[in-house]
UniProtKB/Swiss-Prot annotation:
It comes from Cronobacter sakazakii (strain ATCC BAA-894) (Enterobacter sakazakii). Pathway: Metabolic intermediate biosynthesis; chorismate biosynthesis; chorismate from D-erythrose 4-phosphate and phosphoenolpyruvate: step 2/7. This is 3-dehydroquinate synthase. Signal peptide: none annotated. InterPro entries: Dehydroquinate_synthase, DHQ_synth_AroB, DHQ_synth_fam, DHQS/DOIS_N, DHQS_C. Zn(2+) binds at residues 184, 247, 264. NAD(+) binds at residues 71-76, 105-109, 129-130, 142, 151, 169-172. SUPFAM superfamilies: Dehydroquinate synthase-like. Keywords: Amino-acid biosynthesis, Aromatic amino acid biosynthesis, Cobalt, Cytoplasm, Lyase, Metal-binding, NAD, Nucleotide-binding, Zinc. The keyword Cytoplasm applies. Its cofactor is Co(2+); Zn(2+); NAD(+). Its EC number is 4.2.3.4. The keyword Zinc applies. It catalyses: 7-phospho-2-dehydro-3-deoxy-D-arabino-heptonate = 3-dehydroquinate + phosphate. The gene is aroB.
Amino acid sequence: MERLTVTLGERSYPITIAAGLFNDPASFWPLRAGDQTMLVTNETLAPLWLDKVRSALEQAGVKVDQVILPDGEQYKSLAVLETVFSALLEKPHGRDTTLIALGGGVIGDLTGFAAACYQRGVRFIQVPTTLLSQVDSSVGGKTAVNHPLGKNMIGAFWQPASVVVDLDCLQTLPARELASGLAEVIKYGIILDRDFFLWLEENIDALLALDGAAMAYCIRRCCEIKADVVAADERESGMRALLNLGHTFGHAIEAEMGYGNWLHGEAVAAGMVMAARAAERLGQFETQDVERIIALLKRAGLPVTGPETMPPQAYLPHMMRDKKVLAGELRLVLPLAIGKSEVRGGVPHDLVLSAIADCQQA
């Protein structure tokens, strides 16, 4: 078992990583006998994990209600959020309740935002079931729902009480979802950890085969990096923005193509190549390193080009709604080398369009 801590003073919390955690009632710290909870999951995951998690909680004397939502990015919306609020109010649940997010990034983001809003804030626990959520979205307190005009535009910073990562969940993960998660894994190597990127080049096949030791190390290392970044910059005023490599381009793809048609990691993968091409055109990133990124993404089963039906000009309106835009200026996360990156403003729009076009022709 691995246990890490996200250090945020009195709001610090543990990340527990191991196989078989759902079998142990003690995994769901800080819940105690008599606590009231609302377990939020989706229609795909409920048959797989709901009974197991519910049983563990009830063994510990925890009171469990549940709400089962439709599955898909298109349901990460205000309308579905209201479904969660209605379930909480109908019981009713008070300010001392705990929400439990059992699912991937959509469930985690939506449940976390519900927790941030309900009665002006209640406790919640992240129980991520996808690789993407285990290595990224469950850690750090970013919660949100989407708007038709932009991804994650309505949300709050609201830290969980704990994160419970049961490695057994990956055994039921579809191959496409596994690849999507690997995009965020590869991102960490590009932005902050060259040695980890080199390790990924050597071990990507083991991760695709769900090798237990390789996957445990991979998730732990990603969570270590994320925890350190969040501890240093919780509200994304500086260093934390580096975690958005590829996301400005990727969110544009998701919004333009319709939420759910491209998985988040797929869009981020294409976006990271676009960011690398932009950095290459600026003369700050070597062509051979662009090719290494492309090669690793391809081996992970990820796209390295944008949608054929989305011309470069379609990206900019979405990109200008990005949360990193300041005073009307587009700011991009760009690599400087494998393992080093920066947030850069003032990148000419023509250069951005050319970088996107480079990827369309790849």
